[in-house]
Amino acid sequence: MGHAISSLAVALGCVFFLGGFAWGAYVYQPYTVPTDSMAPTVGAGERVLAQRIGGEDVRRGDVVVFEDPGWGDLPMLKRVVAVGGDRVECCDDQGRLSVNGRALDEPYVSGRGPASPVEFTARVPRDGLFLLGDKRDSSLDSREHLDDAHQGSVGRDTVRARVDATVWPFGSAGAVVRPEGFREMPGGVSRPGPWNAVLWTCGAGAALILAGAVYGPFARRGGRRGSP
């Protein structure tokens, strides 16, 4: 009986663990952050998981992975601060970024200075996204492309994924929080992906495998002791 319970626990554990792993691999794409332009949210060299989504699912405040030939040959990570039809400008008399006249508090921005060391105003075209790094004093982002035809915006179709969590190094691992400042704006903020569910599924599977592997020898030993 003990052997059957042990085998069942290991089998179920394998199902949960492999199923969770496959689920995560289907939903998420891992990326290594190449620069510190998104510090302190994610730093250079950190490993993140980005949920595969289409551009139509992007909301203000999302940290996205995108590819635009006009910005370079490699995928880039930036934060969406404005979407199609928005007017974005910086800075007000308190040094804050404004979207459609609404000033934003941005606790994720690195440093204590203004939201941007360079003042700017831009109108985001339809199906466009205006992107800024969280380390505003050194990030190369939409501000570097204000003279382009789309005033620094990229198309929604350039988005490949949305960053949901940091997974390496372990000391900085955790979910990327959706900014409260954008919550009351039209469209609100995006919902977190299934990161926690994937993690718990894999964890439950690993726990069942371990419990079954440990319980089996004890059950067999107990059976031998009880035999005549």
Regions found by a protein language model. Give the residues of each.
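Extended hydrophobic leader/signal-anchor segments used for secretion and membrane insertion
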Residues: 1-228
